[in-house]
Amino acid sequence: MVLIRVLANLLILQLSYAQKSSELVIGGDECNINEHRFLVALYDVSSGDFRGSGALINPEWVLTAAHCETEEMKLQFGLHSKRVPNKDKQTRVSKEKFFCESNKNYTKWNKDIMLIKLNRPVKNSTHIAPLSLPSNPPSVGSVCRIMGWGTLSDTEMILPDVPHCANINLLNYSDCQAAYPELPAKSRTLCAGILEGGKDTCSGDSGGPLICNGTFQGIASWGSTLCGYVREPGSYTKVFDHLDWIQSIIAGNTNVTCPL
């Protein structure tokens, strides 16, 4: 998942950023097959294209980033190797999708979140289990785990057969503001990465979970075009700030609005 930058990248002076429509972990290693029972692989039904990842939060619901959305989505659970699937792999399709706003009017720093209701529940198994929602917000300095089937390089699309994982740090929001001047004064996002560079989510990792001190705290949203670049951390939708919206939707209150 995490990208190790070559020396040439360190000489690049351009500071640019772009949404990670599907990101991969740079600088990481293959995830342990038993550490990501909640990780979901997302595909576009019509094209078969891989769209990113999500997290199973209960047997009927998946939480991911809004920009991973396609008209009809296929979701695979219990997946590690794409070529040699686990025997307990399960496949579902999206029944309903919910966004903070009906017109999907999210931005890079706000409302990049989507709830997917499955066409039928998945069953817990050796490689499938939901991830609990947070009961408290994360603390700056926390060690956070990122994971996904995203590209292993930011210079070419190299999608791995298995998910990669890496550890990064939860940073101050001001660290992201310094890297990306367009960011507003306040945002319902988390800033996370390694300021020295070398580890990051990248294309193909979008929608995957940011797990801080063992708790689901963020959703991979966007970051630098040069994944893992020095002082260009990533931005993650803050799950804790959207708990009321998430829980209300699941309870059947589809008229609930996201926090401002």
Curated annotation (Swiss-Prot):
GO cellular component: extracellular region; secretory granule
One example GO MF annotation: serine-type endopeptidase activity
Residues bearing glycans: 105, 124, 172, 213, 255
Tissue-specificity statement: Expressed by the venom gland.
Location relative to the cell: Secreted
Signal peptide start and end residues: 1-18
Complexes and interactors: Monomer.
Family: Belongs to the peptidase S1 family. Snake venom subfamily.
Protein known as: Snake venom serine protease KN5
